[in-house]
Amino acid sequence: MRTQGQQISDRLTVEVDCHSLGPADCPSMTSSFSPLESPTPTPTSLYSHGSLTSPSWHEAGHYHSLPMERRPSGTPLRNAFRVTDFPSADPMGMQVGTMERPDQLPVSSEYLSGYDDINDQLWIPHDSIPKTFEHPTFPYQAPMPQYHHTMGRNHYYRPQAHTAYLPESASNPCLSRPMFSRHDGLSHSASMSNMLPWMTAPESLAPQTITPQQAFPGAGPVTPPSSNYSDFPASLQTFKPHTPSTPVRSLSLGTPRSDTPQSRMSGHYDYSEEYPVSPVYRDGHLIRTHRQPSRKPSKKQLVRSNLSLEKLPPIIKQVQFKCKEPGCKGRFKRQEHLKRHMKSHSKEKPHVCWVPGCHRAFSRSDNLNAHYTKTHSKRGGRNRYVATLDETSPDYDPEFRGQLTPDGRPIYGSKLEDLADCDLSVDGWED
């Protein structure tokens, strides 16, 4: 066994008690391997809190890059894992071994299901254990595991079981302290190698080496940043946000347009209204494109070009029938309308009002009927009221011809010739 005086900050000692065998039979059972190379990336602080009982160990006959040999034996072994008291690099100066932890954990088929026979001896060569990350400033930094597709029998990957025991600072390398230290002695490629497995799902990509130039093209060499956040790598500013190049049309008019692919897709070739195209961003630069006026005339222009005074039909047609009386400007569309108008200019008025005291004559019968309804059917007018011409009166009888009472009611049985004072002179007639 190694002494506790040695500064072994990344070793986990495996002690195997062989009570039934002699010391010469199992000289190589006491060995040490790095927990950083285990399939579960568990930091030192995780083992100090008694979380060793839960990691899912490989159920195959070998670890990746860690060969094992099986030596059959007839005597059963009582194997146990023991966490030794090794100093931690925590700034608080706390010893890991002084914290509460299980002293012994029996190794059974539950943890090493690849070994069905518990009588076999587990031997790990001391020279085959890789020695990585022995720098004293990386007590909590653990490389992300690289899972190979050539696993042994009964092995399957359980990602939820691994992430349940990892704190946020261990699973996310961007939050660990050594990445922001300028004295850590690591280059930018080493930091990027720890970030890339965390950024990519392990089950979706095969293990491969990705350089920073392949992951971030055009960024150039970047030096490790300092502890303050103001000196963050300037290469992140080279990443430009992606903006859609599809133009958005506005409703303003009067802007010239050009024959662009966007205009071909829109299909607005037959209109003269111009729609400006929104700015297009290409490689982070603003590119303004304007449309030029199309040469094809629009529909409105074609309609306006056909409108002229010579081609327009007359709004009012020329009236063919005119009144021939001098001084009369009567115009009529029909011949019968002109004949009826000509009767108004003649001296013949055969249609005379029968109301006693009126005796007004008209050349047309329709004019006489209008005279009855407008003048004699209303009370309080300057003409005499006749109840037989009023539609609202109970004595309404448009066919009555006879004598009337002073209030305009009819006197049935009387005749118009019986009136002695009836004046039928022509002077009383009105045109």
Curated annotation (Swiss-Prot):
Residues 30-48 have a biased composition (Low complexity). Disruption phenotype: Blocks conidia formation and increases hyphal branching. Affects the expression of seven secondary metabolism gene clusters including those in the biosynthesis of roquefortine C and meleagrin, and up-regulates the expression levels of most cellulase genes. Residues 29-51, 211-275, 287-306, 390-412 are annotated as: Disordered. The keyword Cell cycle does not apply. Keywords: Activator, Conidiation, DNA-binding, Metal-binding, Nucleus, Repeat, Sporulation, Transcription, Transcription regulation, Zinc, Zinc-finger. Induction: Expression is controlled by the casein kinase CK2. This is C2H2 type master regulator of conidiophore development brlA.
